[in-house]
Amino acid sequence: MSSAVPRSGFVVFCVLLVVTLALYPVLRTLGVQIYSAFTGKYVSGYHSLLLVNCPTEQTARDIGRIIMEKRLAACVNIFPRTATMYYWKGEIRDATEILLLVRTKTSLVQRLMTYITAIHPYDIPEIITFPINDGSQHYLKWIAEAVTDS
C-alpha cells in the first residue's frame, strides 16, 4: 500500500512535467505579452529577422508571397542583385542573388525555415536569423498582429 502512494505521486509529477513542457511556448508567449502590456517595454528576442538569398527575383517574389499568404511573415523586403561569393564543391563561385529580408515572430522561425527550405530551389538555401533586440513599439506590435501562430 505504501508503495502505491509514491508511485501515483511520481505519475502525477510526470504528467505535470509533460503538460508544462507541452504548454511552454504558449505560456512563454502569454507571459511576454502580459509583461509587455504592464510595463510598456519590449521583450528582446520576441521578433526575428531572416535573411534568405534566392537565385532570381521571381523566386524571391514567389517565396515572399507564399510566406506572406501563409501569415508566417509580416513583411518581406526584396533587395535586387546582391553580389555573392561562396565556396561550393571545393571552388570559389561568384553569383548574383536576390536577398529577402523577412520579419516575423521568433516563435515562427523554425516553421518558416522548414517551409522555405522545402520550396527553395537551392540544395542548401541560405537562411540566417537574428533576434530583434528593440524597435518601434507600434511596428513590433504590428508584426505580432500580422502573423499567426496557428
UniProtKB/Swiss-Prot annotation:
InterPro entries: Ion_tolerance_CutA, N-reg_PII-like_a/b, N-reg_PII/ATP_PRibTrfase_C. Residues 1-31 form the signal peptide. GO terms for biological process: response to metal ion. Coiled coil: none annotated. GO terms for molecular function: copper ion binding. Keywords: Signal. It holds the Pfam family CutA1. PANTHER family: CUTA DIVALENT CATION TOLERANCE HOMOLOG-LIKE, DIVALENT CATION TOLERANCE CUTA-RELATED. Homotrimer. Belongs to the CutA family. This is Protein CutA homolog.
